[in-house]
């Protein structure tokens, strides 16, 4: 006795999945996350296997190559990371001697971060490899599709930032307290 065949999924016209999602893998955030997981795994392998740094640490290295002498809080803001994760990555990069920390004159609590010569060498060796992976990924698209994607990503980033700042109806996270916020009764 054979089991009945599963009911066919309602078909969605290609190019319409985002506007009319039928399943989790039709949702924009899910699809972007999967793309990052798959394509990003190559960057992780390059970073960790080739240079002994995490992808997050690579983000800090790239930012400090572009903006040397940046305070950790500004680095966190520009990378969209929380301060604790940034602090852990900074501590790791300091121990690997890829970045240096210099106290500000007049206020030793304030500091700026810069790449060391070793950190700059890692950046200069790794960046062309990451750019090549980026180009390989984009090679699957026509030039006009790449341009449209670039424009769409720019607009979506602006929209997401606007939503985060204006959507006060969405509950805040309280991860340090174990999840959802519960008002004291």
Regions found by a protein language model. Give the residues of each.
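Exposed, interaction-prone assembly regions rather than primary DNA-binding/catalytic cores
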Residues: 147-185
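Short, polar/charged, Gly/Pro-enriched helix-capping and turn/loop motifs at alpha-helix termini
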Residues: 42, 46, 133, 137-140, ...
């Amino acid at each position: 006795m054979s089991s009945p065949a599963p009911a066919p999924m309602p078909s969605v016209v290609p190019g319409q999945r985002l506007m009319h999602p039928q399943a989790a893998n039709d949702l924009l955030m899910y699809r972007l996350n999967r793309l990052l997981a798959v394509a990003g795994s190559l960057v992780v392998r390059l970073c960790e296997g080739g240079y002994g740094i995490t992808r997050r640490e690579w983000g800090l290295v790239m930012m400090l190559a572009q903006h040397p002498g940046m305070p950790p809080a500004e680095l966190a803001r520009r990378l969209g990371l929380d301060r604790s994760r940034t602090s852990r990555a900074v501590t790791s990069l300091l121990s690997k001697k890829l970045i240096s920390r210099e106290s500000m004159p007049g206020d030793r609590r304030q500091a700026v971060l810069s790449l060391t010569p070793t950190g700059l060498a890692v950046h200069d060796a790794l960046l062309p490899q990451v750019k090549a992976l980026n180009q390989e990924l984009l090679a699957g698209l026509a030039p006009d599709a790449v341009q449209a994607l670039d424009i769409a990503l720019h607009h979506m980033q602006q929209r997401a930032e606007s939503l985060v700042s204006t959507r006060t109806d969405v509950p805040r996270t309280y991860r340090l307290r174990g999840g959802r916020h519960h008002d004291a009764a």
